[in-house]
Regions:
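Short, acidic/hydrophobic/Gly-rich beta-strand patch recurrent on exposed beta strands
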Residues: 14-16, 30-32, 50-53
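Short alpha-helix capping/helix-loop boundary micro-motifs
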Residues: 23-27
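C-terminal structural segments of small proteins and small subunits
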Residues: 42-70
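Intrinsically disordered, low-complexity, charged/polar segments
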Residues: 2-5, 66
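Short, charged beta-turn/beta-strand-edge "cap" motif at the junction between a beta-strand
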Residues: 1, 18-20, 43-48
Length: 70
């Protein structure tokens, strides 16, 4: 299951990041988005998602959301 399928407001543990793009991996890691970290979907936007990771909120697009396996 990935972030696009997550329920709003529910906490999930990130199981893995599935991408072949090293820049995308590095970007997600810089947000604190890596295996074992808690992620919460705050809302669905047209073409993206607002997620909470640690104590911060981020807007990510569908491509990023699909790469985050929960």
């Amino acid at each position: 299951m990935n972030v696009t399928q997550a329920e709003i407001g529910k906490e999930y543990i990130i199981k893995s990041i599935e991408t072949q793009d090293e820049e995308l991996d590095a970007f997600l890691f810089s947000l604190g988005c890596y295996s074992g970290e808690v992620i919460t979907v705050i809302s669905h936007l047209r073409g993206g998602f607002v997620v909470a990771i640690k104590d911060a909120r981020y807007t990510i697009d569908k491509q990023l959301a699909e790469a985050i396996i929960i």
